[in-house]
Amino acid sequence: MTEFDPEKFEDKYKHYFPQLQRAYKAAFETMNDQYDSELAHAIDQQVLSESEPFYEGDGEFRIELPENPRERLSGVLVNQERFETVLERYVEELESELQAVFGFQ
């Protein structure tokens, strides 16, 4: 567990890059085990790779997604409802992993 400093999180890629990688990897592994691996991989590589984590305070994180995440997805057939459901669950998992990595859980 890493000691968390909200001010350092403003420059997260300088101060917390390994921890961010660990959280994203753990979230991917969970999603890959629970959902279609092609869809999980596509969301990871084509949507979440362009996402931005933010610390909201009180141990809470928020993931800002790129614009039009569904339009970024290619190479996998999925309807809009399924995509939104899996993406929402993936974001929840990622936020939870960030909380765990930084000792809020």
Language-model features and meaning:
Residues 1-105:
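Acidic, polar-rich N-terminal leader regions of halophilic archaeal proteins
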